[in-house]
Amino acid sequence: IDPLSRLFVGFISLLFFICALYAPSYLRLRFERDNRILVSCLLIVLGMMSLVTLSHHLGLMWIAMEATTLVTAPCVYFNRNPKSLEASWKYLLIGSVGIALALLGSFFLVYAMVQAGSESTLMFDELIEHSHLLSRPWLHAAFVLLLVGYGTKMGLSPMHTWKPDAYGEAPGMVGALLAGGLTSCAFLCVLRFFHIEHIAHGGRHAQG
């Protein structure tokens, strides 16, 4: 585990701890709603966010990010009314588009290794080690797709339209986890790929 992972997993753990302190009183007030699905989904979200922060595997990190999208959608629908249904579907659809772009960017990054004549890999450490060999056009295309894809999960403009509805309809603790936890995980993904891009350019300049 690297220092960046420790920082993010520590922040997410603290965020979940604070939400866990708030959750019992909130759920007692909302006793008319069955909270078993909400609590189960939140526990899975904690596991998936932790996996994102600790993973050094490109594919595993993407799977964990996709899982957070699927598992948090029922949390947005907690109120079970037409507005929360619309918000959850908007969140799910826009988030899925973003994560699909991130998957395409991941494919491009692996293909950049193949184009450079290197063995394809999904491990970040190996990608960083061989980043100076990556095919520059495919590397740039991969970074743009990954930035847009994971930027959608962060709610960056213009793919931010899901945020007002999702934050407005979700319970307060779910909104906090979306704003603090999910955004942080997506930002970490962008940082991982930015590191590869930065090292790739640094290696080329050093060789030049």
What are these regions (language model features)?
Residues F78-L85, A116-S118, P164-V174, I199-H201:
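Juxtamembrane helix-boundary/capping and inter-helix hinge elements in multi-pass membrane proteins
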